[in-house]
Amino acid sequence: MSVTQRHAEELLQGARELGIELSERQQEQLLAYLGLLIKWNKAYNLTAVRDPDEMVSRHLLDSLSVVPFVAERGDNWLDVGSGGGMPGIPLAIMFPERRFTLLDSNGKKTRFLVQVKLELKLANLEVVHSRVETYRPEQPFDGISSRAFSSLQDFSDWTRHLGSADTHWLAMKGLHPGDELQALPADFRLDATHVLRVPGCQGQRHLLILRRSV
């Protein structure tokens, strides 16, 4: 199955419900990304969502739901455990003036991400094949995002060395992770919690923003 007009309409309408007006270029790139995700998922197992009709809401719109929170927080971003590229690819499309690094330890997934970068001509995107614990960039990131990556404790512990006191950690979760917050490392604190209302998604979605005391 390929991308259809219905997918395009669902994307535009859903983005509007999120308060986002997509440019023609952004719409084209997001749909091209969706097409690549559908194609490569058959062989590479990039996402457990097999039905292309569910991918607009559960992947594209879910990723776009954090756009307002990324918009106000820095120019240099890391997406940890990026997998099939969510939310990193949609965010790189929405913010072409900012830099996004997508990190994953799975070689098949990083090969897919490199292909997306090339085909969509995303000059602001870097793909890194590495374990997060051993990744050593030249400077700390302004923001670090994760989506269904790990517990908040592991997310904090594994990425501590990649941020600073000025960094915002954005963890996208389903149900509110109250138990995980109890296990947050002592040098991290919860800065804000936001309920995300994603068009077409029935389940709960939460964004937790963490800060670190250095």
UniProtKB/Swiss-Prot annotation:
It holds the Pfam family GidB. Keywords: Cytoplasm, Methyltransferase, rRNA processing, S-adenosyl-L-methionine, Transferase. GO terms for cellular component: cytosol. It comes from the Bacteria. Gene3D superfamilies: Vaccinia Virus protein VP39. Belongs to the methyltransferase superfamily. RNA methyltransferase RsmG family. It is found in: Cytoplasm. Specifically methylates the N7 position of guanine in position 527 of 16S rRNA. It catalyses: guanosine(527) in 16S rRNA + S-adenosyl-L-methionine = N(7)-methylguanosine(527) in 16S rRNA + S-adenosyl-L-homocysteine. It is an enzyme of class 2 (transferase). This is Ribosomal RNA small subunit methyltransferase G. NCBIfam families: rsmG_gidB (TIGR00138). Its main location: cytoplasm. CDD domains: AdoMet_MTases. One of its GO terms (molecular function) is rRNA (guanine-N7-)-methyltransferase activity. Signal peptide: none annotated. InterPro entries: rRNA_ssu_MeTfrase_G, SAM-dependent_MTases_sf. Its EC number is 2.1.1.170. The lineage of its organism: Bacteria, Pseudomonadati, Pseudomonadota, Gammaproteobacteria, Pseudomonadales. It comes from Ectopseudomonas mendocina (strain ymp) (Pseudomonas mendocina). S-adenosyl-L-methionine binds at residues 81, 86, 132-133, 147.
